């Protein structure tokens, strides 16, 4: 059913409207009276009139149609009210009431009953445990806020975060199209709201704060289309163990893995930020028409700010644009002899409005972002330069205003939709987020397991180490030469056939921490084989002998995330996977270009290219792609290849652990 009755209702009933002005039901009613031009119906079984309006004892007594019912009653009455809504033919409902899934099993059962009742009448429910929904046309929340009409939609899974964003929007004069507080997402899910807003002609960008995702598969299916229509920016609560625990008691959501969430946002083409200030700063870009690029020219009247900004640009992986000689020649004509025509372009501390104007005229056609920093000084004010920048709208201008009149300068630029900041580092981070936006991808998960792989893994909770190596070979992943032995003579024969030196290690049906058990011996030569076998066979009767390879040790793994499903992991291998923690995540299945990006993100690509030998990165990429499909094909719960040794001959799975 359409979400129009929720977002654009023709009539609204407030169930639980109160005569007490401190009660939520009264606040919502007064907010609607102040902002909504449609029909409003207060519902209270003990009142005849509230806030000068006729009150009805139940929804069923209302004479006209009701598009939207906002319910703010004690939770024990919520189901009864929803039954009335079904009988009345209400189309949508916002359930403000809390005390449902977020407080435990009893609340969860009540929430299920509430939603099953609503479904009988085809009622779409926002919440429960929500602050509500607000737009320039109606305030269906208990927040005291009148929003300015704008093009940014805010979707939040926290009433407190939502209230702060409303305050921020008013304080910064930021217009919004909608703010939606999702609450427990018992019915209407975040992906549905994102999809609806992506089709809304009054919304240019969507900003989303989430603590958990209701349905990972649906999210991965729906949000790529939304992100292809307009920017969708995400921030997530529950990044740490403590934060994830707080999420459970806040909205009853499963926080899931923070790193997997980030990978999911990359997959759907969203922009992911890690702190609230950057999240809100991006609003200054997404509604701007400025063509923002990752190549940056810094124009400033402060050498120190130029240095700090250059550092920030370098740390962000962005580029400082080279100034062409012809433009340098023009700049020399306006610069003092103490200033050089280079990037950052220091106009000197005595630069006034005119020097800024002359410099901007010269550099305006450079194909880059012009990051213009103004430190307010006696010879120049931020506001004066802000007015200069208005002449270069559409030329990729970003203003950074620093000084006593920075607020008025920011207002001048913002009124013209030119991105404006009061710190250059914040501007640089916003540029990085915007220019590194990934392309949306839809993940098609069709299990196509190889029959021999199915036979090998059927009915098992885990694979023995030698079975895991066989599975690698079935899927075309290289392994070192190897063999399993159970006697000294067999060990000698297998080692001779492999060639020296070899690695000898304990082997068992269950996955073992072999190194911790002192069950791995490297650099075994011919005359050592029998004695090493005797040593290892004291731990396990079965011993594995492998060809000893040299190369870069890489970690490739997989897991089944409870929210987003199968995910592939890449990072430094051996002991360094725990020490460096430079692991990149990708939602399965990944494609070769995504695998390469994962290698770059985890720094494994840099490690490979730093080697003098031509290590086979292509083989590693193909292995990552294969693993990402294997874990889907066989529904693998956990998988580690550590190490996967990469050298000039390919990528070789040395130790493999697989759990189902």
Would you name each region that the model predicts?
Residues 1-660:
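Catalytic-core regions of core metabolic enzymes
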């Amino acid at each position: 059913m359409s979400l129009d009755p929720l977002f654009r209702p023709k009539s609204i009933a407030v169930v639980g409207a109160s005569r007490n002005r401190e009660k939520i039901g009264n606040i919502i009613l007064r907010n609607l009276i102040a902002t909504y031009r449609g029909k409003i119906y207060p519902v209270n079984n003990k009142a005849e009139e509230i806030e000068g309006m006729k009150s009805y004892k139940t929804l069923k007594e209302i004479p006209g149609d009701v598009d939207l019912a906002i319910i703010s009653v004690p939770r024990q009455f919520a189901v009864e009210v929803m039954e009335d809504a079904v009988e009345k033919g209400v189309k949508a409902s916002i359930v403000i009431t809390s005390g449902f899934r977020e407080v435990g099993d009893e609340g969860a059962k009540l929430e299920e009953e509430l939603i099953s009742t609503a479904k009988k009448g085809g009622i779409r429910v926002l919440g429960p445990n929500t602050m509500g929904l607000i737009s320039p046309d109606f305030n269906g929340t208990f927040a005291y806020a009148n929003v300015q009409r704008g093009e940014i939609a805010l979707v939040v899974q926290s009433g407190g975060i939502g209230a702060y964003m409303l305050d921020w929007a008013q304080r910064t004069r930021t217009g919004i199209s909608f703010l939606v507080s999702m609450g427990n997402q018992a019915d209407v899910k975040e992906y549905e709201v994102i999809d609806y807003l992506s089709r809304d002609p009054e919304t240019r960008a969507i900003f989303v704060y989430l603590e958990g995702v209701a349905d990972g598969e649906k999210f991965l299916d729906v949000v790529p289309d939304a992100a292809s229509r307009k920017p969708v920016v995400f921030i997530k609560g529950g990044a740490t163990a403590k934060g994830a625990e707080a999420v459970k008691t806040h909205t009853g959501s499963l926080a899931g893995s923070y790193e997997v969430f980030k990978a999911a946002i990359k997959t759907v083409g969203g922009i992911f930020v890690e702190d609230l200030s950057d999240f809100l700063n991006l609003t200054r870009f997404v509604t701007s028409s400025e063509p923002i690029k990752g190549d940056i020219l810094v124009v400033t009247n402060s050498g120190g700010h130029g240095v700090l900004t250059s550092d920030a640009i370098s740390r962000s992986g962005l580029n400082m644009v080279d100034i062409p000689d012809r433009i340098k020649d023009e700049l020399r004509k306006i610069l003092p002899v103490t200033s050089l025509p280079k990037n950052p372009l220091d106009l000197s501390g005595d630069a006034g409005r005119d020097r800024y104007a002359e410099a901007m005229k010269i550099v305006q056609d450079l194909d880059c972002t012009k990051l213009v920093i103004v430190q307010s000084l006696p010879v120049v004010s931020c506001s004066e330069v802000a007015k200069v920048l208005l002449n270069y709208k559409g030329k990729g201008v970003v203003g950074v205003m620093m000084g006593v009149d920075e607020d008025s300068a920011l207002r001048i630029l913002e009124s013209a939709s030119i991105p404006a900041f009061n710190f250059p580092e914040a501007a640089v981070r916003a540029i990085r987020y915007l220019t590194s936006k990934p392309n949306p991808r839809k993940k098609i998960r069709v299990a196509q397991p190889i029959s021999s792989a199915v036979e090998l893994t059927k009915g098992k909770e885990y694979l023995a180490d030698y079975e895991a190596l066989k599975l690698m070979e079935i899927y075309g992943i290289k392994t070192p030469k190897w063999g399993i032995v159970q006697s000294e003579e067999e060990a000698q024969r297998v080692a001779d056939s492999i060639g020296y030196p070899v690695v000898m290690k304990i082997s068992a049906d269950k996955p073992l921490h072999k190194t911790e058990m002192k069950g791995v011996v490297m650099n075994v030569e011919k005359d050592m084989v029998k004695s090493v076998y005797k040593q290892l066979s004291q731990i396990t009767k079965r011993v594995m002998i492998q060809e000893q390879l040299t190369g870069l040790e890489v970690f490739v793994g997989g897991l089944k995330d409870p929210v987003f499903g199968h995910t592939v992991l890449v990072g430094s291998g051996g002991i360094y996977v725990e020490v460096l923690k430079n692991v990149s995540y990708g939602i399965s299945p990944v494609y070769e270009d995504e695998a390469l990006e994962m290698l770059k993100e985890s720094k494994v690509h840099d490690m490979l290219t730093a080697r003098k030998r031509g290590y086979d990165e292509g083989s590693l990429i193909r292995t990552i792609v294969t693993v990402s499909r294997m874990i889907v094909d066989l529904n693998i719960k956990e998988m580690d290849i550590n190490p996967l040794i990469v050298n000039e001959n390919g990528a070789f799975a040395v130790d493999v652990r697989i759990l189902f």
